[in-house]
Design a protein with these regions (language model features):
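Transmembrane helix-loop-helix hairpins at the membrane interface
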Residues: 53, 57, 66-178
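Specific transmembrane helices
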Residues: 1-68, 72-84, 160-178
């Protein structure tokens, strides 16, 4: 998780060095912060709904989240929320999106690239499809608001809430040590 975040940050830094488009602004705004929280909660609820009705997605989400979350302890979940939320949004929405264009093509390329990053194997395609939809929504929010804060906050919320729910559900399944 930490290594991936550093690699993504380095890619973003190198990209910014060579690309005159620059970085999408990140402006602290209560309204955009609340919009990011709302978007993050909406994405999380939509994911929960898809989890219930799409068996292939459920299987792939469980496999992916087991791989990522099982070795983590509760305090690590804070880092899981912050590191990918910041590094992935900086690269995909902060740097890539303005470089390609704050338009439909930019949204499509940014969202699809984000989805592909979340595919650990070809069998994980249902999870990649959902991650692509999420990437499109995050890119759209960045274009509409012109503020990187919205997708960053949304991404952090999705990661934090999803990981806490997963940990709670799987903690209850463990046998007691009595």
């Amino acid at each position: 998780m930490g290594v991936t975040a550093v690699v993504l940050l380095l890619i973003a830094k190198v990209w910014l060095h060579f690309d005159p488009a620059g970085l999408l602004p990140l402006t602290l705004s209560q309204q955009d912060g609340l919009l990011g929280i709302g978007l993050g909660l909406g994405i999380t609820l939509a994911s929960a709904g898809i989890y219930q009705i799409w068996p292939d997605y459920r299987k792939n989400a469980d496999n992916y989240l087991t791989m990522v979350l099982q070795p983590l302890h509760w305090p690590d979940l804070l880092w899981l929320g912050l590191l990918p939320g910041l590094s992935e949004e900086l690269l995909f929405r902060g740097v890539m999106l303005p470089a390609i264009g704050l338009n439909q093509l930019g949204i499509l390329v940014s969202g699809t690239s984000f989805g592909v990053l979340h595919m650990s194997s070809l069998q994980q395609w249902p999870y990649m499809v959902w991650a692509t939809v999420v990437g499109l929504a995050l890119a759209y929010s960045a274009v509409v608001t012109g503020n990187l804060l919205v997708p960053v906050v949304a991404h952090v919320v999705v990661n934090l809430v999803s990981s806490m729910v997963w940990k709670l559900r799987h903690q209850q399944r463990l046998p007691s040590k009595d």
